[in-house]
Amino acid sequence: MQSATPETFDEAYYQRFYFDKKTSVVDPMHVERLGAFVCSYLQYLRVPVQRVLDVGCGIGLWRDIVARHFPQASFHGVELSEYLCRRYGWEQGSVVNYEARQPFDLVICQGVLPYLSPGDL
């Protein structure tokens, strides 16, 4: 198995698997609950969150969750899909070789690993 390429995640892919309710593979409520748990736990631990990195951010489901819990935090999305980078303004990149220029307080990489080959894990 090879890791997914940017060509895999074109507009048709997202229309079919994210934006069409009949064929969607993502449950926004599940992501909402997961994100609320993660953010609430960080708040409970009193972890200061000012800068958030979401690698493999997709359509940005975590962005609004983070903003509700940490309104002062900046959110930076990195995404392999050229289509989503154009649509949402993400930085194009891959979890396999992404190198952040600055440190982040919270790094999210949810739902990405199934798209990677064993050699890229």
Give the location of each predicted region.
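A conserved beta-strand element that flanks and buttresses the S-adenosyl-L-methionine
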Residues: 108
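N-terminal, positively charged/glycine-rich alpha-helical extensions of SAM-dependent methyltransferases
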Residues: 1-20
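Short catalytic micro-motifs in class I SAM-dependent methyltransferases
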Residues: 111-115
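Conserved class I S-adenosyl-L-methionine
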Residues: 50-58
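A short, conserved alpha-helix within the catalytic core of class I
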Residues: 116-121
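Class I SAM-dependent methyltransferase SAM/SAH-binding core
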Residues: 59-97
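Conserved alpha-helix/loop element of class I SAM-dependent methyltransferases that forms part
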Residues: 30-48
